[in-house]
UniProtKB/Swiss-Prot annotation:
Classification via PANTHER family: UNCHARACTERIZED PROTEIN YQGE (PTHR30327), UPF0301 PROTEIN YQGE (PTHR30327:SF1)
Superkingdom to which the source organism belongs: Bacteria
Name the record gives this protein: UPF0301 protein Neut_0448
Gene Ontology CC: one annotated term: cytosol
Membrane-spanning ranges: none
Provenance organism: Nitrosomonas eutropha (strain DSM 101675 / C91 / Nm57)
Protein family: Belongs to the UPF0301 (AlgH) family.
Disulfide partners: none
Gene3D superfamilies documented for this protein: VC0467-like
Length: 186
């Protein structure tokens, strides 16, 4: 069996996915290799804005638009840690490149740059991440827990978090409400 690589793809939770955290989620896969996968849920927000988060970290945000940018709940792993998905990749400490333009950074330097209006052009800030051990995601895919589709920057950075799941579904020509819990074969 040939290994799959879902880096820079969306995972769309199927209705039958029994894990309540991932129900009706859209997850962006930042890295997927033989050791496992790492991603961020990109359609579930917290009650915290990026402006409030930066202020809580002792920073003085300069951009008023940050008060309208929600912090996302990226996943159930390390929910006390922040992760910034951004374009362009840039030269931040602790950055993982998902593709030539999109990076995931888990260091304070990028947050300080965002507060000072010197950060990347496009950002999503999340608390926590989603992780899969080696072979775990492949097993979940075989159980029809997820649909996959190549990610689009437009969906990540130009749409509100509520619009992201339906937009990703539309890439597949599917309406989420038409999905069934039942698996069948033709």
């Amino acid at each position: 069996m040939q290994a799959i690589n879902l880096t820079d793809h969306f995972l769309i939770a199927m209705p039958r996915l029994e894990d309540s955290f991932f129900a009706k989620t859209l997850t962006y896969i930042c890295e997927h290799n033989e050791q496992g996968a790492l991603g961020l849920v990109v359609n579930r927000s917290t009650d915290l804005s990026v402006e409030k988060l930066l202020t809580q970290l002792g920073m003085s945000p300069q951009d008023p638009a940050l008060s309208n940018l929600p912090v996302l709940l990226g996943g159930p792993v390390q929910v006390d840690n922040g992760f910034v998905l951004h374009e362009p990749v840039g030269a931040w400490r602790f950055t993982l490149s998902s593709n030539v333009v999109t990076g995931l950074t888990a260091s304070i330097d990028i947050l300080q740059a965002v507060a000072d209006c010197q950060g990347p052009e496009k950002i999503l800030v999340a608390l926590g991440y989603s992780g899969w051990a080696a072979g775990q995601l492949e097993q979940e895919l075989a159980q029809n827990a997820w649909l996959t589709v190549p990610a689009q920057s437009r969906i990540l950075f130009e749409l509100s978090f509520e619009e992201r799941l339906p937009a990703a579904m539309k890439l597949l020509g599917i309406d989420f409400f038409n999905l069934s819990n039942e698996v069948g074969h033709a």
